[in-house]
Amino acid sequence: MLRPLWPLFLTALFLNIYRAASVLIDEAGKNDFEISLLGKVNDLVYDTKNEYLYAVSQKGLLAKLNASNGDVIWRQSIAPETSQLNYNPVTNFIITVDKDYLYIWNSKNGILDRKIELADGKGKLFEVNKGFVYLNPHTRKFIELDLQASFSISIERDLQLDAISFLTYAEKNYVLFKRDGQFVLQALDHNYAVYGPETVLNVPENAQLLVTEKDVIIYSSNGVIYGIHVSMADISQLLIDEYKTFEWSSIPGKRHGYSITVDSQSTPVTYLFVIIDSEFVLIDEYIHEDTEALGYIHMEDNQTFSRVFAVANQIKFAPATVITIPNQLSRPVFRLFTFAEGEISAIVILDDGTFFSFSNTELVWKREEALAYAINPSILPTTLLTSYQKSIQDEENSSVSFLNRWYRHFNQLIDFLKHPHGFTSSSVLDDAFTTKIIIPTSTGSIFCLSSDPKQVHRILWRYDFNINPESVESWLLDISDEDPKFAFVHQWNDAFSFYILNASDGSVISQKSRDFKADEFYYVDNISKNLPNQIFAVKDYKVLPLTGDNSIFEKISQEANSIFVYTSETKVEGFSISADLTMDVQWSYNLAEGEIVIASIRRNPHEIVASFGRVLQNREVMYKYLNPNLFALFSKCKNDLVVYVMDSVTGSIVYQNKHQGIILFDKVYGVFSENWLVYSYQSDVPNLSTKIISVELFEGSHSNEKIDSNEIYSRHNDYRPYAFTKAYIFDREITTLGVTNTPQGITSRDVLLGLSSNQVAMIPQALLSPMRPVLRPNEKANDASFIPYEPIIPLNDDMVLSYNKRVYGVSQITSGITNFESTTLVLSTGLDVFFTRTAPSMPYDMLSSHFDKKQLMLTTFGILLAVLLTKPLVKKKQLNTKWYN
C-alpha cells in the first residue's frame, strides 16, 4: 500500500533539499554594511519647518540629517577648520567659509552651487538685510551674496571706507569703520553706498571688539564689557565688569536674547540680555560649573526665556524638568543646543562625539559618533563550523549515521510542510560570513559590531572604560571558537590600564593598572608552540608580564630566536628576556645623524604560507625568502625616506632603499606579507605623484636556488636575500594600506587601499609584482607568468570595493579570514565604518550568483522522474522479449 506513495515522498524530499542546499552562492554585497559618521559636531542648525538638521563636524564634514531619526541624508567634505555654518531657510542655501574659499551649498541635495576664492582668508561673513556679505577687514572690497530661491549670485563690490564689519537693523545696513582713532558707524543704501550722516561711537581707541553681529556691538575696555545697539549708536552701556574669557551666543525668537558667558574669579557666569527700547536689559544671571553647558529657549507664548543646562548625566529645564542622559562614565558635555520650535527640544553632544536628540523629556535617537575615532580594530574569525555542518559531522562520527541523516531530512520535510514560505536555506545553514568586529576608540570606548545582515542595529554592545586616553593598543589574545578574548591597554603620561575582555559579551575577565607609562607593549604569538599568547610591557629595560605567569616567560627566555625589537627615535635594538625578567640587548643599530624613525611594520603572526616558491612558466621555481623574523623600518632624513628590512634575531639589514623629495612623512604607509613588502609615499621627484614600491625577497637571483632553512633561522644568519624591486605611479592619493588574508594562504594576497577620493580599493598582486618584465616596444614577453611592466597603475572600476559609496576618512584597513579559502573580510575605519568581503582570486569554492540552481534541480528531478516512469515500460518490454523468444 505504501509503495505507490514513495515517489511523492521523494518529490517532497527533493524540493526540501533544493531549498536547503548547503552549496553557498556568492551573493556579493549581502554582508556589506556602512555606518555613516560625522565625528564631533561643532555647529548645528535646526530647520524646524522641514525637520532637518545641518551640522559641521571637527572631522571636516558638512551634513544634513533627518531630525526625526538622525539618519544621514547627505554629507560633503569641507575644511576641518570650518567651525560655523550659515543657513538661509528661505532660499535653502548653506554657506561655509574656510581660510581659502567661501562655499554655497544647496541644502536639498548637498550639491556645491558656488565656490568663491578668498584673497587672504582673514575676512568674515556677515548677515545683512536681504543676504550675506563677506568682508576682508581694512580693505575697500567685499563680496555680496545674493541668494535666490533656486540660484545664487556673488558680486564683488568696492566700498568707500576701510570697513571693520557690517551690521543691520530695521531693514537698513550699516558699516563700522575706524578713522583717526575713533569708531564710526555709517548707514548704507541698497547699493551699499554711503547714505546719510555718520555716528561716532563712544568707544575708546584701544577697545577690543568682541561681537559685531546684526544690530549689536559688544566690546571690552580695561577688563569691562560694554554693549551698543545700532539704533542708539552713540550710547555705550556697561554690561559686565571683570572677566577673563568670553563666549557669546544669540537665542532666536520674536525677541532676541543675547547670552554672554565669562569667567569671573575662575567661576563661569552666564548673563542673558534682551534689547528693550534700544537698551540692554539683564533678565538672567547664572553661576555654574565648568562641567555644565548652559543654554536658553525663547518661549513664544509669554515672551520669556527658559534656562536649560546639561551636565554629564542630566539635562535640566527650568523650573524642575529633568532628562537623564545615558552616559556611562559621566563624560563632559561638549555642546548643548536648545530649540523652542519643532519636534526636537534639545541636542547634547558629549566630548567623545556621542549625539543625543531629545523631544520634551524623551530620548528620540542617538548617534554613536565615538566610532569615528576607531583605532586598531579586530575581526573575529567566522564560526569554524556552522550548526548545519556540525550536525553533519556528528552524523559521520556516529555508527548509525545513515539513520540520523534520514531522521534529519524527515524533520526538515515536516518543517517545510508547516512553513513552506518561511523555510529557507538560512534556517539550516548559518551565514558563512557572519562575524563580530571589535573596535576600540581613542575616546576610551570599546564597541562590538555584527556583520549579520539580519542585525538591524549593528552595535551589539558598547562599554566605556576611560575618558580620552592618550594612546590605545589592542590585540586578539585568544581566537578560540568558544570563548574569544580581546586585550587592550589605555595609557596616559603617568599610568596605564590593561584589560582582557570576553569578546562575545564585553565582560571584563581581568584588569591591571600601573602608575607609570610603559615604553612599549609586545604581543607574543605562541600558538605554534601550544602555549597561550602573551602580552608584556617594557619600562626602563624591565619586562612586566601582563598575561600568564612568570613560568611562561621563562620558557620564552630559553628560546634562542625569541628576540624582540625596541625602537626609539634614533636607535633600533633587539633584546631577549632574561630569567629575571629584564631586557638582555642582543644587538643595536644606530641610525645616521639626522635620521629619525617614523614607523615599523611586521608580518601578521597568524599568516599561513601555502607556497614556498613562485613557479615560473618553464616549471622552475623562485624560492621565497620566508624568514619569519623580518620587519620593515621607515625613517626620515631631511626630505628623504629611508627604508630598511631587518632581521630581528641578528639585527642584520637584508634590504635598504632611499627615496628623495618626500612631501609628507605622515603619509607613508606599508604592508609586509610573506616575502613581500609594499609601501607608498608622495614625492615630487621627478614630479609630484603617489608612488607605490613593491619589494619581493627571494633566496637567490635565479630560479631553483635554495639555501638551507637552518641557516635562515640561525642566530648567526648573515645571508642577504636577493630583492626584486619595482616602482609604480598611482593616480590617487593613498590614505592607508592593508593586505588580504585567507585561512590557508592559497588565494592571492592583494593589497587593500584607502583613497583620498573616499573609496576602498584593491590592487591585484599580479599588478604589483616586482618581477613584471620590462619590455622594449613590440617585444614579446618570454615568460607569460607575469604581466609586462607598466609604470602607471590606473584605478579601474573593478578595483573599487566600496562600489558607488563614499567612505569618508579611511585611515585603517583590516582583513579577516572566513570559512572559504577564496574569500577575505575587509573592514575600513577612520571616520566611517565600512565592511565588505572580496575574493582576490575569484570565488572558486562557491557557486556564482548567476548559477541557476533551480534549473539544475528541476533537470535532475526530471531525469529521475523519467527513469521512474520508463522503468515499468522497460520491464514490460523485457518480459515480452522473454515470452515471445
UniProtKB/Swiss-Prot annotation:
Main location: endoplasmic reticulum
Stretches assigned to the Cytoplasmic side: 875-885
Subunit structure: Component of the ER membrane protein complex (EMC).
GO cellular component, one term: endoplasmic reticulum
UniProt membrane topology term: Single-pass type I membrane protein
Pfam family, one: EMC1_C
Lumenal side: 23-855
N-terminal signal peptide: 1-22
Lineage: superkingdom: Eukaryota
Function: Part of the endoplasmic reticulum membrane protein complex (EMC) that enables the energy-independent insertion into endoplasmic reticulum membranes of newly synthesized membrane proteins. Preferentially accommodates proteins with transmembrane domains that are weakly hydrophobic or contain destabilizing features such as charged and aromatic residues. Involved in the cotranslational insertion of multi-pass membrane proteins in which stop-transfer membrane-anchor sequences become ER membrane spanning helices.
Compartments in which it is found: Endoplasmic reticulum membrane
Membership in a protein family: Belongs to the EMC1 family.
InterPro entries associated with the record: EMC1, EMC1_C, Quinoprotein_ADH-like_sf
Gene Ontology process terms (BP): protein insertion into ER membrane
Transmembrane portions of the chain: 856-874
Keywords, ordered alphabetically: Endoplasmic reticulum, Glycoprotein, Membrane, Signal, Transmembrane, Transmembrane helix
SUPFAM superfamilies in the record: Quinoprotein alcohol dehydrogenase-like
Keyword Transcription regulation in record: no
UniProt name for this protein: ER membrane protein complex subunit 1
